[in-house]
Amino acid sequence: MKKYLLYASLLTSVLLFSCSKNNPNEPVEDRSIEISIRVDDFTKTGEAVRYERNQGSAAERLITNLYLLLFDQSGANPAKYYITGNTFTGGTWLPDDMKVKLDMTQSEAGERKVYVVANVDNAVKTALDAVANESDLQTVKRTTAMPWSTDIASPFLMSGNKTHDFLANRLLDNVPLVRAIAKVELNISLSEKFQIVPIIVNGSLSEFKFRYVNFDKETYVVKPTTKPDNLISSANGVWPQITDWTVWGASLNTSPAPDAGTGYTLDANGKVTALRIVTYLNERDSKGATVEVALPRVDDGTLPPPEFGPELYRLPLPDKILRNHWYKYEVEI
């Protein structure tokens, strides 16, 4: 009899414990929701580089503010949160954990289409404030009059999205923030016919020049299905008219070197042996973006002018320039 009483007592304890586990003080569906984010790596590719990932520098991963939009299942009625500090109306931002804790509960949230936008300027914020539907995000953009480095610079506009059922899990984990810009790196090794002793003025190579051709001015929060062109070049002069082209600078020769700029290498005799240029640019759906470089030739006296004058090297960029891609080229001229 004692054995049966002991068994009944143990069974009662287990049932009571089970009931307490299934009935916490606050119902599961009423717990506040959380969203964690991460900055996506660059996709690094190019003619002489295998496909790889690169997380980028600290400046390329920098987040200064966030704008959250939680649309309902139909893509409408967004709940919005603008975050500039650790606390904000409606929640808390934990930058070390890359996590946002919202006061909104699971039952209030339900299933949501969640968009996270980072590094929002005043113009983009005003446009996001007016967003009523998910499709409206494709109209929100930042315009840069000179869309290359140093005007396109950190902190970069980023965005990411996921659909999530907060009733099933109060944590939406790892929303990837993707930079809305691309990066181009061009490393040029010069053959002997271009290895001159240059005229250097304030660190720049006076005879070496370049220009960006058909770069797009618009940086979209969410890229339209087909992005319309709004193009500009860094100089109006078309080869061989290079007076207004940019002279080759030495910003990448400094230490620590910036993430974008121009640089060069001199040998022991003071001759230019290599050139380097790194710039950010906006995505494009149509081909035509190009980097043009004017290179002075060594004057060996065998040809009359202008045959030994500058030559043009043209690097066509990919037919489609994709956001968050790092295009790296190693070329010999």
From Swiss-Prot:
Keywords: Cell outer membrane, Fimbrium, Lipoprotein, Membrane, Palmitate, Signal, Virulence. This is Minor fimbrium tip subunit MfA4. The lineage of its organism: Bacteria, Pseudomonadati, Bacteroidota, Bacteroidia, Bacteroidales. A lipid is attached at C19 (N-palmitoyl cysteine). The record marks R53, N54 as: Cleavage. GO terms for cellular component: cell outer membrane; pilus. Pfam families: MfA4_C (PF22358), P_gingi_FimA (PF06321). Tip subunit of the minor fimbriae. These filamentous pili are attached to the cell surface; they mediate biofilm formation, adhesion onto host cells and onto other bacteria that are part of the oral microbiome. They play an important role in invasion of periodontal tissues and are recognized as major virulence factors. It comes from Porphyromonas gingivalis (strain ATCC BAA-308 / W83). Belongs to the bacteroidetes fimbrillin superfamily. FimA/Mfa1 family. Component of the fimbrium tip. Minor fimbriae are composed of a structural subunit, most often Mfa1, and the accessory subunits Mfa3, Mfa4 and Mfa5. Mfa4 is required for Mfa3 and Mfa5 insertion into the fimbrium. Fimbrium assembly occurs by linear, head-to-tail oligomerization of fimbrial subunits. This is mediated via insertion of a C-terminal beta-strand from one subunit into a groove in the N-terminal domain of the following subunit. Residues 1-18 form the signal peptide.
